[in-house]
Amino acid sequence: MKNKRRNFLKKSAAVGAGFFIVPRNVLGGNGFISPSDQLNIAAIGAGGKGNDITHEWASKERVIALCDVHPDGTHGVTDSRKTYPNANFYIDYREMLDQEKDLDAVTISTPDHTHGVIASNAMNRGLHVYVQKPLTHNIEEARMLTEIAAKNKVVTQMGNQGGSSQGVTKIQEWVDKKLIGKIHKIYAWTNRPVWPQGFDMKDMDEVKPPNLNWDLWLGPAESTKYTSQLHPFNWRGWWDYGTGALGDMGCHILDAPYKTLGLHYPTDVECSVGSVFEQAWSQNFVPKGCPASSIVTLNFDKTSKNDSKIEMVWMDGGLRPSHPDAIPADDFLGEVNSTNGVLMIGEKGVISCGVYALGPKLYRKGYETIEFSTNDYWNCL
């Protein structure tokens, strides 16, 4: 029988439509949750990030089921099964949803191309969902999930580590106080891909791991034979399964400027990509693979938080912006070694931070540099 807290979840979800966030202190009353008031959670995708997230949930809720297409796979699946020996284990998430009648919510930490179909299936059964970033594989799926969430009145959240970190809060404070004046340009970059990307997939005869259900791993994608070029981890570099460096890291890096400046849809977007050259002057076009590097320029109108049009430039594949005059030459851009970061450039100075908005710094001419230390990127709201 559903307890009071679970009923409250259902009622709170009816307040608004679409994807939104209900803070933990709301779900838990005054922050005191009795054992009988725990939610029954299942993890779909028990390795990698799924393993990490399950540990976070288990500190407050009850993990009653685990699901993974590779039951003895690496990247934490075995660890999850040992940590939660009383949780029922499934290979097919559909079987799990059919069997586990007492479920309240699921976490989804699977390859990008399966997020939409799994989340829609769960929400259509009245389950609340926590979906790892990126929310979906494409825009159409995101719109579909928004409609399904509203129809079924469920609580939803996308996992975006760093989304409510102290770094974001501090940058918001600096922006609101207009310490660097009107912001007119943003640079954001990552050292990703750190997986093979920009190449044609090789035709290799490989033996599928014995306990991997490859058909379930493929899910809605076209049937193809097993290859280690996809599983584990490397699926990120192929359009049929992942979203490349931008889709993998953009939400962690672009979140701070989007949130603090109140950005919405861009007015226009321009993209250029770099590719790998097979030999001298012979360019390698890879239609199914994400680019080896890219530069994406987005233009935004002024917002209520920033009275200036903004040009945002995203870079990946090892590309990054030139060193601004406002930042000392011996200082890193963004994070240590300048591997990932954000520069928000205004009339009076520059704000710099790393991925997850870690370690924000404020540089202003004639003033001492302000540095704010953070290490709380696991804040996900």
Feature map (PLM): residue ranges:
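Extracellular/periplasmic catalytic domains that process cell-envelope and extracellular macromolecules
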Residues: S34-S36, Q99-D102, N124, A149-K151, ...
